[in-house]
């Protein structure tokens, strides 16, 4: 393994209940096995003091209705704070960043679930992020019904998790469309056993790291 390899940005994506926490552990174990141990973990929305405040507004605001576009703009405000103040500096230091969600979430949830115009989303993405994107994305795919059942088992649902099943069906459909067109993304069947999901993730990460370190 080339220990002088630059920092990389790996993102975990998926619906509620997809198992991103378990997936992160699998990614860490595989990276460590390959000698990559200088890791940083992020989540979206969140990850900086301002971004965490926006996260609370996005997920738990109850004083007034949050419009779809206000939600979208708060997500991008939180995202750019995290990218500029945390992720880019970490990558410059050679750290490998493992993110719980990134821009693909907005493309899927707001573009698919909320049905916001895709051209608006693309324009906003380019304006805010420029050409910044993950080096590798693992999309944990499962049916919304299974995911929501898992999420309910964790306790009270937040504002996003309370959306109806049709919302999550649209979100999943958009996720799959986006991932299939993305050569830097891999689909993981998250309906399998934890052992099988873990094995698939480790294989995907190992294959990707080997491909970029040749």
Curated annotation (Swiss-Prot):
Pfam families: Thymidylate_kin (PF02223). GO terms for molecular function: ATP binding; dTMP kinase activity. Keywords: ATP-binding, Kinase, Nucleotide biosynthesis, Nucleotide-binding, Transferase. ATP binds at residues 14-21. It comes from the Bacteria. The keyword Endoplasmic reticulum does not apply. Its EC number is 2.7.4.9. It catalyses: dTMP + ATP = dTDP + ADP. Disulfide bonds: none annotated. Coiled coil: none annotated. GO terms for cellular component: cytosol. Belongs to the thymidylate kinase family. HAMAP family: Thymidylate_kinase. This is Thymidylate kinase. The lineage of its organism: Bacteria, Pseudomonadati, Pseudomonadota, Gammaproteobacteria, Pasteurellales.
